[in-house]
Swiss-Prot record:
Positions with a binding annotation for (2R,3E)-phycocyanobilin: 85
GO cellular component, one term: phycobilisome
ATP-binding is among the record's keywords: no
Protein name, entry field: C-phycocyanin alpha subunit
Membrane topology: Peripheral membrane protein
Localization: Cellular thylakoid membrane
GO BP terms: photosynthesis
Gene name of the encoded protein: cpcA
NCBIfam families: phycocy_alpha
Similarity section: Belongs to the phycobiliprotein family.
Amino acid sequence: MVKTPITEAIAAADTQGRFLGNTELQSARGRYERAAASLEAARGLTSNAQRLIDGATQAVYQKFPYTTQTPGPQFAADSRGKSKCARDVGHYLRIITYSLVAGGTGPLDEYLIAGLAEINSTFDLSPSWYVEALKHIKANHGLSGQAANEANTYIDYAINALS
């Protein structure tokens, strides 16, 4: 089960054999009030996913030109490498939308961050590439208001995990 602040509060109360307290209920209420904005953000990121992925990969290639000039399976010197880069950026974006829908960092923690260092070192991938891609997505997602705040929270969380 994916952890969210609500599921953690329920688990803690259940472990202690008690009902949810006022603080926990207020926290749940706050989450439900933000849920509409989170769903709007997930919908916006999803509907613009290909544009965001394409722009993010171009931002990586511009900041790190060696990624398109160096041959090898971890680089984007050919169409196969470019496809892998787009796939990886898409994976990050998809997991961010899952976190928005779940209302917590559980999907990011479980599906992305756990084992991230091992994956990057095994395949000789630079976290800075994905930081740049996520910064581009954050700056260009086209969301506004509370939906932008919700999306940026999870994008920043992923950036911090990579940094």
